[in-house]
Amino acid sequence: MSQRQQFQFLLSFLILIFLKFIIQIRCDESNGVIIIKNIEDGGSGSGTVSYCQMEQIRDEYITIKTNYGIVSSIGSTTASGSVDGKKEFSLIFNQLIPSDIGYEYFFLRWGTNKQTIATLTDPFLNPYRFNIVHLNRTDLYSIQPTTNNSYLVENLNSISKQVTFNSLIFVNRKSPFFFIFSNFNKVCDNKNNFNMEILYPNNNNNDDFNNSNNNNVDNSNFCSSIQYGNQLVTIKSMSSGNYISSEGSTNAWDIGNKFIKTIPLSSELTDSNYFKIITFENNKIGFLDKFKSFWSWNNTNVEVSSTMLKNQKFNLEPVLNNPSCSKNCYYIKTGNSGYIKEYITKNSVNGNLLNSGSSDDKTMFLIKLLPICSKDINNYGTSSSTTSTTSSSSSSSSSTTTATTMATTTTSKITTTSNINDSFGDDENLINSSSVIKFSTPIIMIIIILINIKF
């Protein structure tokens, strides 16, 4: 091999290593998320939740910049029939989290037989029109800033009450809902941490949202501290722990399927399966103290709690030989008492959900890690996906076909009845590691060819 060929080969090799290093850094920035699914002991049936539903992941991230951080969203798309040239987003999102920690997602939960609204207290830099995908339809909303940091939200597809407020309030007459959003604007302890505000309406069929007439609204300054890695975070939430009641039941409030972020306990631990798990507990975010799972059966939500030690270590044990669950599913195993003791089984006679417990039982609380930067990312949301049996495709809204289609697809391995599908959509300006890898290969080849021509 001549000296020129040796130099050529060495240069090409160094370029490959350099590009791979860049790809790995971009991949690591996104981190993984962990998802908790309600798992039932027994087969699927009408009215049950989906079993370890595979979340469809596309190639790109979508981010919306705000004054105080980045809103990470899933299920976004560039609409072919956008309004006034603005892009429309199908969103199921989230809360603001510093980039060195990663992203944490929460489902948007659509209420059934109950009125629910919430506030979004972080201002957008620009008005957006976006879709909100829920159980059986897609609604298009418009966010328009007014004056004094107020916002007007309008449902463009159905009759809704237009509200201006110092924070953002969603009210949809036909499809009442809530979603949760945190911000860096207001602080609870004057330490530059961020807060969360959640407003709850009553359930007396009163169409007006009025704090003075709303028994379930608690605007107290209750603060709860949580920790992301080495960073202390505080939130503002309800201090009384009230729930919204649905017809004939109490304690019916829930946030649906819970997206939570896992954080390694310490760098000394060699077992990467040990995490601190952050989720909702009594209307606030915190380390898993009482693990809450909400089940929907015959339009009745049942709450199950398992008391844990605060800041408990949890081991994620892989699930093996479970046909209802794909890979990357785990059981939660505690460091002291084995598996979570409390679980739910379905009485096959009358369909009621019963509480029972066994330290050796593994049927409850399956969780699934979503490998955002995994080599297996292309196993999600590819051509192997099939159309779900859910009804969102029958949406009567005027939102885009693309968004509706995305909301009704899931992987062929999973049976789903919930139709909340969080798929990463398409946006030409936002990059996920998978797309970087895809586009890097031809770029590498072109660079090598140019080097060969030059020498």
UniProtKB/Swiss-Prot annotation:
Signal peptide region: 1-27
Lineage: superkingdom: Eukaryota
Gene Ontology CC terms, in alphabetical order: membrane
UniProt KW keywords: Glycoprotein, Membrane, Signal, Transmembrane, Transmembrane helix
Positions of glycan attachment: N136, N148, N210, N298, N421, N432
Bilayer-spanning residue ranges: 435-455
Subcellular location: Membrane
Residue ranges, Extracellular side: 29-434
Membrane topology of this protein: Single-pass type I membrane protein
Region (Disordered): 383-402
Stated name of the protein: Putative uncharacterized transmembrane protein DDB_G0290991
